[in-house]
Amino acid sequence: VLGGNSKEREISVKTGKACIVAMKKLGYIINTFDPKKKSFFEIKKSKADIIFNALHGEEGEDGYAQSFFEYSKIPYTHSGVLSSMNAMNKLSSKKIFIENKIKTPLYYVIEKKGFVHSNLKKKLDTKKLKFPLVIKPNNEGSSIGVKICKNFINLKKNIKVLFKNYETLIIENFIGGQEIQVAVLDNKALGAIELKPKRKFYDYKAKYQKSAKTDHIM
């Protein structure tokens, strides 16, 4: 399953095509399914042995697709419905981290409905948030919509832009440091990679565009 309707569609298609090449080399028979072209309900008719989920972002990683996979009663790869919902929803993730005493940056949630700019400075002070700050959509992947704000004017500008497409935003203290990724399969770490982007941070372009020239250190 690849493509879909999210802002990460292009990356999902690339992911899916790479997986198809690899799986065909291993002798598997592959049928592709793109939710942008067919209804998820059509999956049940496929009679597939397993669904390989190569979707990215909204409807692909937030529990939506997973609920249809469960409905189809066909085994599928990657996380289930609840874990996908919590992982894609940054606020839910942060609450789980806090409940389990896992460190996470201080934050403040703002909603498009009823938001008042004049109250923001006081709220940031109350939440002990200091510049530079990070603002991002609550439900988005691949660093889409993530902005680092150095001052209040910059923050207000980005809030206005992001509210055009998103209802809920999260403002956090910026935490600098190393960017390290660790893949885990069946509770086993497969190795770590340090990422050194040439850009300000590991944003969408740094992740996916060769021109960004991000260094990957094994």
Please give the residue ranges for each predicted region.
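Active-site nucleotide/adenylate-binding loops and adjacent lid/helix of ATP-dependent enzymes
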Residues: V1-L2, K14, I30, K44-K45, ...
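ATP-binding N-terminal substructure of ATP-dependent carboxylate-amine bond-forming enzymes
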Residues: V1-S92, E99, E111-K123
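Residue-level detector of flexible, active-site-proximal loop/helix-junction positions
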Residues: K37-S39, E58, S83, E111-G114, ...
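Short small-residue beta-strand/loop micro-motif enriched in glycine and branched aliphatics
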Residues: H78, S143, K213-I217
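Phosphate-binding site of ATP-dependent enzymes
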Residues: K150-M218
